Amino acid sequence: MSLLDHVDPEISAVIRKELDRQRNTLVLVAAENFTSPAVMEAQGCVMTNKYAEGYPGKRYYRGCAFMDEAENLARDRCKKLFGAEHVNVQPHSGSQANMAAYFATLKPGDTIMGMNLDHGGHLSHGSPVNFSGKLYHVVPYGVSRKTEMLDYSEILDVARECRPQMIVCGASAYPRIIDFKAMREIADEVGALLMADIAHIAGLVAAGVHPSPIPYADIVTTTTHKTLRGPRGGVIMCREELAQAIDRAVFPGIQGGPMMHTIAAKAVAFKEAMTPEFRRYQEQIVRNAAALADRLIENGFDLVSGGTDNHLMLVKLLKEGITGKEADETLESAGIALNKNMIPFDPRTPFVTSGIRIGTPAVTSRGMKENEMREIADLITEVIRDMKNPATIESVRSRVRALCERFPLYPELG
């Protein structure tokens, strides 16, 4: 970073401090991961200089031949990776991918069914504070109070009553496998489109570790970071008959020029995701999540739905008598980064919460396995059981640093 040190030492110092934080923190935020140096190199390339409004072969500006090559590589690799008929790699984020999907297929005021945010859904699936909840009539569905899992017969009942134009399946905090086939059958019964948002599980789906929605959903959206371990961005996959509407909704519908440096980085990430190493990595994510969840249960914690099938888990803190906000703040001071999270039927507000969400993608990227997950679960337990004791916090912080040093992050960055 010698050039940045010279041009902007303040920003250079902030970046170095963030690198140090990532290296010496157990990152358990389920939505975060560590992308490869190759992806970061592509994202910092000269393609950031180029405007490329439009699509390959049909650009508004001249000089886009190599932009076309890069975007076609990204599209073709994503198609192959997921088995999709059509792919748009231009969305700047997952929320913009969802917006484009809605704009391509719905009218303002149409009815959408989406998973309740409090039960594990996402803001862009119809939350009243989000554009999706303001533009469309949203009927939420949730998990069973008894099992804390999706009850597809209950979802069918809701669909029959409201007759939505679209059903959105997918979540940001749901620890179980989603039955996309069942959701397709529900959508077919009421004549609705089915959209699957796989932002959290895209890497698992790409590797065959989680069932794919591609055979069942009309539209599939995702982010390219999280388990997919690419740059921050979005992707839309759809059936060929929706391709033109989707592409027009992205550009010129909601975006102008695409971020070609990010699209180049997406192409790199898709190539990495086609390797046997990536599949082994995804399998390890799931094994690690199971090991961490099992140890937390052994240590006396209650988990939403009793465990996990994927990369994340939700820990209920009601019987501990503490809030998610208190837990995540104290854990961060001990070097463990996760997030407070609503649990199903949570009596507290989203800014306080009764739970925490824990994910294993980032620590798995560092090379940690089941033994380390059990160690991490014990560290979390120690902090939560003795939150008011500064000596405990400092002791855990020291052990977290030692664990991180055993699995170094980005040694090539100096």
Swiss-Prot record:
Reported function: Catalyzes the reversible interconversion of serine and glycine with tetrahydrofolate (THF) serving as the one-carbon carrier. Also exhibits THF-independent aldolase activity toward beta-hydroxyamino acids, producing glycine and aldehydes, via a retro-aldol mechanism.
Entry EC no(s): 2.1.2.1
Pathway terms, separated by semicolons: One-carbon metabolism; tetrahydrofolate interconversion; Amino-acid biosynthesis; glycine biosynthesis; glycine from L-serine: step 1/1
Record family assignment: Belongs to the SHMT family.
UniProt xrefs under CDD domains: SHMT
Chain residues that bind (6S)-5,6,7,8-tetrahydrofolate: 117, 121-123, 241, 349-351
Protein's UniProt name: Serine hydroxymethyltransferase
Enzyme class: transferase
Subcellular location: Cytoplasm
Cofactor(s) needed: pyridoxal 5'-phosphate
NCBIfam families, per the entry: PRK00011.1 (NF000586)
N6-(pyridoxal phosphate)lysine: residues carrying this PTM: 226
Site-annotated residues for Plays an important role in substrate specificity: 225
